[in-house]
Amino acid sequence: ELVTRRGIRTLSPRHSEYKGVYEGSQTDRDLAYYNGCCLTSLLGPYCEVCFKMKGAAFLNKAQWLVNGFYEDLNKHGVGAFSELYDGDPPHEPHGAISSALSTAALLEVEYLKNKYKEE
């Protein structure tokens, strides 16, 4: 329930404090950031652990995770990956429109996919 096509949610949708949409005042957005938004930057460490545990059996899931981002390249910041996404579908992009952390995480997942394809 934490893993989405746009990153890892910061809180479960089942939790009473969950905020699935990043909107409103600065306080509302800050609450959503830590209570439900999807952070792309967490995908790198998540996939690294999954590959270590499951090996090549995780390849399809890793591919599923990154495919959604390529669809998003022309949506929020042309040719860039956003900092965060709504926790609720359709996971609209928010925050920095060209996030180095998000880009690094996706590059790490691509690297891991290639590494485990070769093994």
Label every model-predicted segment.
Residues 50-64, 111-119:
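Structural helix-adjacent loops and short alpha-helical linkers that scaffold large soluble proteins
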Residues 1-38, 67-119:
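Extended glycan-interaction surfaces of carbohydrate-active proteins
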Residues 37-48, 60, 64-67, 104:
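Feature representing long, continuous alpha-helical segments
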